[in-house]
Amino acid sequence: LWVWMNNASWVPLHPFSATHITTADIDNNGQDEVIVDFGPGIGIWVFFNNTTWQSLHPLTAGAIATGDLDNNGEADVLVHFPGFGLWVHRNGANWEQLHFLSPELITTGNIDTESEDEVIVDFGPGIGIWIFRNNTAWDGAALLGVSADHLGAADIDGN
């Protein structure tokens, strides 16, 4: 695993290759951490503040996403563990299961007028795309039966 550092040079970050990788400020210090799934037998690790590696979970992920679900400035880590459902690591503290089903795709974004990010998941054909709104409940007005190849969230109309 390599990183392009300070727009100047490639620097090795870890000797293993990643199966999933994302970045987010999960400790609310203004600096992004690198969240890496190194695969079966190694699990998910976080590179904190460009200094130390810390294990986040021993299992490997089907998908990883981040978003500030409670609007406290710390990104929460969402992980689909195949066969175990969708889980969130909140505020660097505890794991909590968000759904017993394992989604095919996960993304986050603030898609309403509230301040926190929503979780948008694709549970696949027959179940569809669902939204976990305002850090409280699954939206029953989801796109039932619809599935996607990719998911994304953005404010395209400026509201």
Positions of predicted regions on the chain:
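Trp/Gly-enriched beta-strand/coil motifs that build multi-repeat beta-propeller-like domains
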Residues: 1-159
